[in-house]
Amino acid sequence: MNDLMEKLKKLLPTGNSPVLLLSIATGFIVAFLIAGFETLTDDLLLAEISSRPLWQIALAPGVGLLLAVSIIHFFGKNSGAGTSDEFVKAFHERKPRLPLRDLPVKLLAGAATIGLGGSLGLEGPSIYAGATTGITLSERFKNWLRREDIQVLLTAGAAAGVAAVFKAPATGVLFALEAPYRDDVNRRALLPSLFAAATSYVTYINLVGTKPVVPFLNDPEYRIGIDLKSVQVGSGESMAWFDASKLAELFTGVETGDLFGALLLGVLAGLGGRSMAWLVRWSKTQSRKTSFVPRVFMGGLLLAALAISADAAFGSPLTIGPGIEAMEWVVSPENGLGLIALLFGLRISATLVTLAAGGVGGLFIPLAAQGVILGQFTGELIGSDRPGLYLSLIHI
């Protein structure tokens, strides 16, 4: 076996070629892992739970927490509920290590948490899957790599995970390079991350399709500066058209009210981000300090109460899941400020309770949902005739 490995090693060119080849392999493997994870979590579990009677929907997050915490406790071997933060932690270690045996544990715990209604996102387990795949390949082929290539493949794997789950390769690269805050490694990891993210994205969309993660944001009404109300648009089965002389009217100018709204939104988002960071740290501390049974029981009870409250207020248990349904609900022009503010409070409470109870998942999608709710609230508060503008701004 050693002779075979030596012969293969001689066939490979020196320099960056091995790490680039392994980055492509990482992206390919990660795409399959995340496609399976998303299908189980979103298309099978969460879709099934969402169609059940309210009492079953309300109880499901508690069952998911029980399963997730049990999986971590009995099969994790000292592994906690962390996902994307484990990637950052491993990156800063002298010898990064994410055991492959923990990967199925994290994915199953994440599927139980999110698929049964916990208010966390798919991106956390996806980043963990990518980082673990990258570092595992670097260990298997360490004789072909330089020592610093371990962190490079770790970063490339995380980029592949984000690129797949968000169907956005550029987002994957930016996240993976910025999250660890280490410029010298980021420069070396740029090209491998691009290779891994592109491979993961192309493979993933061929497996699951190109449906946007947040479909309504593709609507032109929610794009910056576009005002479809002022132009008559015709449409056919496969195209839309308008009078060329009306083209200038399609793009509205920036008004003083828009600038004030953007300033207000920036202040609110900044304050909210700082507050949320503190609350997340507090929730994770409670998860570590409180014993197994009380935190799962209280977490399930609180999530059930939040789901029932949301159903009473909005006609749907919008606290369930990562928050896509909540985003789709909040953009309706019929919703008043009071209901939008209530949804903001209920959603953030559900996310914090899921974390404190030991749920496994990411925070990016739930926080993006909070951003959409906050953007719509700001637009309605200042009486904007284009509240969708602030949904676009919050994603910038």
Report the location of each language-model feature.
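Alpha-helical transmembrane segments and immediately membrane-proximal extracytoplasmic
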Residues: 1-394
